[in-house]
Regions:
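Alpha-helix initiation/capping motif
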Residues: 48-49, 70, 93-94
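Enzymes and membrane/adaptor proteins characterized by extended Gly/Ser/Thr/Asp/Glu-rich
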Residues: 73-102
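Hydrophobic transmembrane alpha-helix bundles
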Residues: 6, 63-65, 83
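Secretory-pathway/luminal and periplasmic proteins that interact with or process carbohydrate-rich
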Residues: 36-41, 67, 84-90
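An N-terminal boundary/leader segment
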Residues: 1-55
Length: 102
């Protein structure tokens, strides 16, 4: 699935729209990759619960099935740690803000 994550966004969104790729499959591949490399990279400082992310992916899949998809429906999104995100710790890259929950 790592190959999937190297594809351009235009291809990913087309695969999702044609239902050749499931948002759940894409989210699972993304989470598996994060699990595999984040210990070394520490690219993701805070994340929502895995089960919640997969539930969101299932909801996205349902919207796609109903043809109610939004432009980036089903595409996992990471938010830079410099931007506040509700419910997530935002450190702004500093240990001073290690407990900064918005």
């Amino acid at each position: 699935m790592t190959d999937l994550l190297r594809r351009p966004l235009t291809e990913i969104t087309a695969l999702l729209a044609r239902r050749e790729l499931s948002p759940v499959e894409l989210m699972q591949a993304t989470l598996d990759r994060i699990d595999a490399v984040n210990g070394k990279l520490n690219a993701f400082v805070a994340m929502r619960d895995r089960d919640a992310l997969l539930a969101d992916a299932r909801e996205a899949e349902a919207r796609i099935q109903r043809r109610e998809a939004r432009p980036l429906e089903g595409v996992p999104l990471g938010v830079k740690d410099l931007e506040d995100a509700a419910g997530l710790v935002t450190t702004h890259g500093s240990r001073v803000f290690k407990d900064n929950l918005v």
